[in-house]
């Protein structure tokens, strides 16, 4: 990647200067997203990188030891090779080993007078792997037999939290593009606009943890993404968070990445929709992914590397042109409208049977072009010259009439989509983990990491002073019945740079003492932020800075936490109790006159009870007080007078008080059910109010802790593991999520809109308040020949606020008072296994939204500049006619004395339609 040219955040000496300042943000290089991935991928094959699973990522092994006649072998010994984990079978030959870190192990069973036997077993997070041994009475040495233990469902008899599991096999077989889509199928989760809402909470209230390290950008609460082949398992803690989890109001997504085994192996996958004739399901989609690993160059060392590159023009394809590159002469890779590359590498050093050192590197890059319906015209525009308007003597160029063809010499080519911003996201994590097993039930973990997020939003990689804009934001008005309503303003006038660097050191220690399982730990974080956002970036303000409405800051802050928890087993009942202490400092960048307390702290108790009614039933209850520090941009932003809103260094942590009651029932060895009821009260949420800037007689909208919300609901999950040729899962949620606002900027938007000046005085449905949601999956096939997975989703309508044409003031009671139509999708993935040229091959066919349903996803997408066509015009059109897709008002066509609607058919209003992809996989 080429060096970045820097620009200053200090006043300019003169207009047009190109200042530099080390350490500032600068022009980013915009390479093909795949360009950096291939050299790194080859390099990591030889260098490696890795991290261990978090302490919370453990499972259990159970089984029975019998002799050749089927009789139990009492008191036989069973242990896991290379560790100090093991146990002794009871008088019936049954054994259980708990708290085993996720991974693949070799187990040995032996008894006096019997030959030892080995079996290989895969341990998954919070699941029980069953391994039965049949040992021979002949005293002979037997070879190891590689038999993977069958994963059977087991109820969590000691757990008072509600959890949902997504395995690596789920991610391979389901028709999903990422792990978040798989999580969105679970009970208690509502997926809307790319965000996951756990039990009615906001989308930024879910914490993502990767191998025991929190991976969420503290500036704006975005989590890390991983390729499908990089994930070993995903555990979602929906409720009942123990004290080890903090800074999350709604839930936790805990991801475990894959490790290399003792033998080299892996797979390559390629998916595309580029086949046959292009139709409306053709999105110019291609995905190339691989995951492979095995022993490394040194003894007791393993590695695993995964890469996933996804390139597509999406169903929101604009008219911009993109440079295309070929790979292997038939695979066409980036740059397209949406380009994504994810690289994960993991290196594991097993120093001794009880000590393991891990190094992990994760590198992601996304390059995504925007779609705006009114900035999506390729054709010709008439040029007009105006020499009277300018005061500097120069001739002003303005664009006027538009045409698909060149009418005469006054018409010049224009492609407005190429003047839209491109969003770039870069993420890099390096993590080092040390795991030490001191003895049976005694383990400690130490982790250190550095994470960096870089993001930008600009046009054609231009610096602020390079933007090109037309005077007075000139664009064609809607006086033409052919609907040629477009923007010829020049470059889309917004520019943004963000950077976050987070250093983390955390650890935990657990020990079993009698009937108590004790755990303690903590973490220390140091954050470094840089932020610049401006509109009209080529405008120079009176302070000599580029950009109107300029918002800029550089900030540093430390924070940390400490927790203690105990799992106490007493006469069949299990008490999970803990307490957590969190501390946060705003740093020293803000003057003392504005800060009441630079350091804030809170104590959050957690208590839960699990009561096994029988070996098939468990009841549980949990109470928790949860805190979350607001996104740091709401603390530090708006330090310049030109900013439209101002951060508040005196913000308090947002708070949730949650209760839940759960029941687990094991119907059979293959069928499991889970039922839960939850109640959540959330307060201290962010909104804006007008406040005076200290020392100045002006007021600015300032973020405060004033909003509140609540959610109630019931959840039901029924799982059937694969047996007798099929598997299935049903998840149902009935929930009610209400509050005073759905977004911290709701009041800010209302202040700038005469229609919405009145704020609600009571709780109303939140934007993601989908009262009923059901998902059902069905898996068919066999391991030898074929497999097919079907996914059906149904959700009741999301709320929306109706608007009327002559409305002057919005009645606050009408906010989210109406409901959109229900949504539903049917998707599938089919796989056919065969062998060719000595390799295992798989043919794939994947289809999403097979019924091609028109599901409304966003009734009011952003439009700039507003003019006569704006988000509320879309809303008014839907309110009056019941038709979605957007429209603007034009002259009276039917003679009734009122302006008539002209539809614009904005595809952003709807979710993606039917897509069909085919693929090929190679396993080795």
Positions of PLM-derived features:
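Periplasm-facing N-terminal accessory domains of Gram-negative outer-membrane beta-barrel systems
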Residues: 54-150
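Periplasmic N-terminal accessory/gating domains of Gram-negative outer-membrane beta-barrel systems
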Residues: 115, 121-130, 143-242, 247-252, ...
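Outer-membrane beta-barrel signature, preferentially recognizing the C-terminal barrel domain
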Residues: 184, 416-427, 434, 498, ...
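Gram-negative outer-membrane beta-barrel transporters
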Residues: 269, 679-681, 700-803, 921
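Transmembrane beta-barrel wall of Gram-negative outer-membrane proteins
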Residues: 282-371, 422-443, 605
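Signature of Gram-negative outer-membrane beta-barrel scaffolds
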Residues: 330, 487-496, 501, 517-617, ...
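Surface-exposed extracellular loop regions of Gram-negative outer-membrane beta-barrel proteins
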Residues: 530-536, 541-542, 585-587, 611, ...
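C-terminal beta-signal and adjacent terminal beta-strands/loops
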Residues: 785-789, 793-806, 832-924
């Amino acid at each position: 990647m080429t060096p970045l040219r820097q620009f200053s955040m200090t006043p300019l000496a003169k207009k047009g200067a190109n200042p530099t300042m080390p350490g500032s943000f600068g022009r980013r290089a915009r390479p093909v997203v795949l360009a950096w991935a291939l050299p790194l991928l080859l390099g990591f094959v030889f260098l490696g990188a890795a991290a261990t699973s978090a302490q919370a990522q453990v499972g259990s092994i159970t089984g029975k030891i019998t002799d050749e006649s089927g009789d139990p072998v009492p008191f036989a010994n069973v242990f896991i090779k290379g560790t100090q984990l093991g146990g002794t079978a009871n008088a019936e030959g049954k054994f259980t080993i708990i708290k085993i870190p996720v991974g693949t192990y070799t187990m040995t069973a032996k008894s006096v007078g019997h030959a030892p036997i080995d079996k290989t077993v895969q341990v998954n997070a919070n699941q029980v792997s069953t391994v039965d041994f049949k040992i021979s009475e002949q005293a002979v040495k037997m070879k190891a037999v590689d038999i993977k233990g069958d994963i059977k469902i087991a109820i969590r008899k000691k757990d008072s939290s509600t959890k949902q599991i997504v395995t690596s096999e789920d991610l391979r077989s389901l028709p999903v593009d990422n792990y978040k889509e798989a999580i969105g199928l679970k009970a208690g989760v509502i997926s809307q606009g790319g965000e996951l809402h756990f039990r009615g909470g906001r989308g930024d209230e879910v914490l993502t943890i990767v191998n025991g390290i929190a991976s969420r950008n503290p500036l704006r609460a975005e989590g890390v993404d991983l390729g499908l082949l990089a994930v070993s398992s995903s555990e979602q803690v929906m409720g009942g968070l123990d004290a080890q989890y903090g800074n999350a109001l709604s839930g936790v997504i805990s991801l475990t990445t894959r490790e290399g085994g003792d033998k080299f192996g892996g797979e390559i996958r390629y998916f595309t929709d580029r086949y046959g004739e292009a139709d409306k399901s053709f999105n110019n989609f291609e995905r190339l992914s691989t995951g492979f690993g095995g022993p490394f160059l040194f003894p007791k060392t393993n590695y695993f590397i995964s890469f996933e590159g996804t390139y597509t023009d999406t169903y929101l394809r604009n008219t911009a042109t993109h440079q295309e590159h070929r790979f292997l002469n038939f695979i066409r890779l980036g740059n397209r409208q949406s380009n994504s590359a994810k690289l994960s590498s993991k290196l594991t050093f097993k120093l001794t049977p009880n000590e393991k050192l891990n190094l992990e590197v994760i590198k992601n890059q996304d390059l995504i072009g925007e779609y705006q319906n009114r900035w999506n015209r390729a054709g010709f525009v008439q040029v007009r010259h105006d020499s009277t308007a300018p005061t500097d003597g120069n001739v002003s160029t303005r664009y006027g009439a538009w045409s698909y063809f060149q009418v005469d010499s006054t018409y010049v080519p224009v492609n407005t989509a190429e003047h839209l911003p491109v969003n770039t996201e870069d993420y890099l994590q390096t993590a080092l983990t040390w795991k030490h097993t001191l003895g049976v039930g005694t383990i400690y973990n130490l982790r250190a990491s550095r994470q960096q997020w870089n993001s930008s939003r600009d046009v054609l990689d231009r610096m602020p002073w390079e933007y090109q804009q037309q005077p007075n934001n000139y664009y064609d008005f809607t006086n033409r019945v052919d609907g040629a309503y477009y923007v010829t303003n020049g470059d889309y006038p917004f520019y943004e740079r963000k950077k976050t660097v987070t250093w983390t050191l955390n650890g935990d220690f657990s020990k079993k003492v009698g009937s108590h399982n004790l755990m303690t730990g903590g973490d220390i974080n140091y954050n470094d932020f840089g932020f610049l956002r401006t509109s009209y970036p080529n405008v120079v303000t009176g302070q000599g800075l580029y950009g109107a409405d300029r918002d800029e800051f550089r900030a540093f802050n430390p924070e940390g936490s400490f927790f203690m928890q105990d799992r106490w087993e007493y006469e069949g009942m299990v008490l999970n109790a803990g307490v957590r202490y969190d501390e946060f400092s705003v740093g020293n960048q803000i003057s003392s006159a504005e800060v009441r307390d630079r350091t804030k702290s809170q104590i959050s108790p957690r208590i839960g009870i699990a009561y096994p009614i029988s070996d098939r039933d468990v009841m549980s209850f949990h109470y928790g007080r949860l805190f979350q520090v607001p996104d740091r941009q709401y603390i530090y932003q708006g330090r310049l007078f030109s900013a439209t809103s101002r951060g508040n260094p005196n913000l308090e942590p947002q708070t949730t008080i949650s209760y839940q009651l759960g029941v687990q029932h094991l119907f059979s060895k293959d069928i499991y059910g889970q039922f839960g009821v939850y109640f959540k009260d959330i307060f201290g949420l962010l909104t804006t109010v007008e406040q005076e800037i200290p020392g100045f007689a002006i007021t600015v909208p300032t973020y405060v802790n004033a909003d509140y919300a609540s959610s109630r609901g019931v959840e039901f999950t029924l799982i059937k593991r694969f047996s007798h040729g099929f598997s299935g899962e049903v998840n149902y949620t009935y929930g009610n999520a209400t509050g005073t606002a759905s977004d911290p900027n709701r009041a800010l938007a209302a202040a700038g809109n005469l229609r919405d000046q009145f704020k609600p005085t009571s709780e109303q449905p939140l934007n993601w308040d989908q009262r009923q949601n059901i998902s059902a999956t069905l898996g068919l096939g066999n391991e030898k020949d074929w497999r097919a997975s079907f996914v059906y989703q149904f959700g009741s309508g999301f709320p929306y606020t109706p608007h009327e044409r002559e409305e002057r003031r919005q009645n606050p009671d009408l906010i989210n008072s109406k409901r959109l139509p229900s949504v539903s999708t049917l998707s599938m993935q089919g796989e056919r296994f065969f062998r060719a040229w000595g390799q295992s091959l798989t043919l794939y066919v994947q289809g999403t939204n097979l019924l091609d349903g028109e599901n409304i996803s966003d009734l009011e997408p952003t439009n700039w500049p507003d003019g006569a066509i704006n988000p509320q015009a879309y809303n008014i059109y839907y309110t009056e006619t019941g038709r979605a897709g957007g429209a603007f008002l034009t002259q009276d066509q039917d003679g009734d004395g009122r302006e008539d609607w002209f539809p614009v058919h904005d595809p952003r209003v709807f979710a993606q339609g039917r897509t069909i992809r085919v693929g090929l996989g190679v396993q080795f």
